[in-house]
């Protein structure tokens, strides 16, 4: 059984395991040439699949290191800032947070993105903390 592990928030990377043994692993920065690459590890993921000679259709599980429930905590913090009398602090947080929230929201569509980008697959997708 193949299992693919991903990190995306910083130092994006992919690792492919078969029956508990590491087959391939790579950081996206090796391909993108961007130190501490932030984003989806497309090239690292493709490298892992190529090293094993498989496609995404052979992968049973994909795990993403991310805790989606943290959004609730961050939203609560933003609302408490709104309630405070310091409107400039709230405005600064909103301006810095919009790109982050947009990237977090896209995490929920990753299974669809992976199927479209890598050609289908019946894998199970897991958020791993």
Regions found by a protein language model. Name each.
Residues 1-129:
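Short acidic/glycine-rich loops and adjacent helix/strand connectors
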